[in-house]
């Protein structure tokens, strides 16, 4: 079982499903996710439903509650050998506790940013998962020092970047970027609410900067 609740986690879930299916062609994968995971062969019993901020959380509460109920029902009915929880901590912490109570092994994949805020969540993760696989090298030290089995597995996006030229000039040429001018990337986030609220502000800053520089 693979459980995630937002777009970025779903991308990791789809890539993971592809790799698992390549290693074990007969494997059966079920979970919570979106179209990418479905295309990767995961049988979905619930779609993803994430929120960002207080006002956005209100309309999604029912869908999150419904997703949790369906997940618990699937845990009881399917009794998966392994449950992989991808980020989405507030939801997945509850799923992990229930999965372990029912006898499934639990792997947490993609650590919440415990190094940035709410570091106490390390202890919570120790209770809901047996092991954790992290994307950033320094995260491994954090969990190992806390006594939790942990392995640095690298960031999946590097596999995608690996398809691009390593040379900066060649990359700029392929992307149609001026080699002599500074390059700024706008990264508003992966959630719909982030895109709707943050991207217009970022674009406004870019327009203002262009006018003043």
Language-model region placement:
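Active-site and donor-binding regions of nucleotide-sugar-utilizing enzymes
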Residues: 1-175, 187-195
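Short hydrophobic signal-anchor/transmembrane segments that target glycosyltransferases
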Residues: 19, 197-213
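Charged active-site motifs of nucleotide-sugar-dependent glycosyltransferases
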Residues: 178-185
């Amino acid at each position: 079982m693979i459980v995630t609740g937002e777009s970025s986690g779903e991308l990791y879930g789809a890539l993971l499903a592809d790799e698992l299916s390549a290693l074990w062609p007969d494997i059966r994968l079920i979970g919570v996710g979106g179209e990418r995971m479905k295309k990767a062969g995961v049988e979905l019993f619930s779609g993803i439903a994430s929120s960002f901020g207080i006002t956005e959380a209100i309309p999604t509460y029912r869908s999150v509650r419904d997703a949790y109920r369906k997940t618990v029902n699937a845990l009881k009915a399917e009794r998966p050998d392994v449950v992989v929880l991808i980020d989405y901590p507030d939801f997945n912490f509850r799923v992990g506790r229930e999965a372990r109570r029912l006898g499934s092994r639990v792997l947490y994949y993609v650590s919440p940013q415990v190094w940035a805020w709410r570091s106490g969540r390390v202890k919570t993760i120790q209770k809901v998962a047996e092991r954790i696989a992290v994307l950033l090298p320094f995260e491994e030290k954090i969990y190992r020092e806390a006594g939790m089995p942990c392995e640095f597995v690298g960031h999946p996006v590097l596999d995608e970047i690996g398809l691009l030229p390593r040379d900066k000039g060649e990359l700029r040429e392929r992307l149609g970027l001026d080699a002599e001018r500074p390059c700024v990337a706008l990264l508003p986030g992966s959630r719909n609410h982030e895109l709707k609220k943050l991207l217009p502000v970022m674009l406004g800053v870019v327009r203002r900067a262009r006018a003043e520089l």
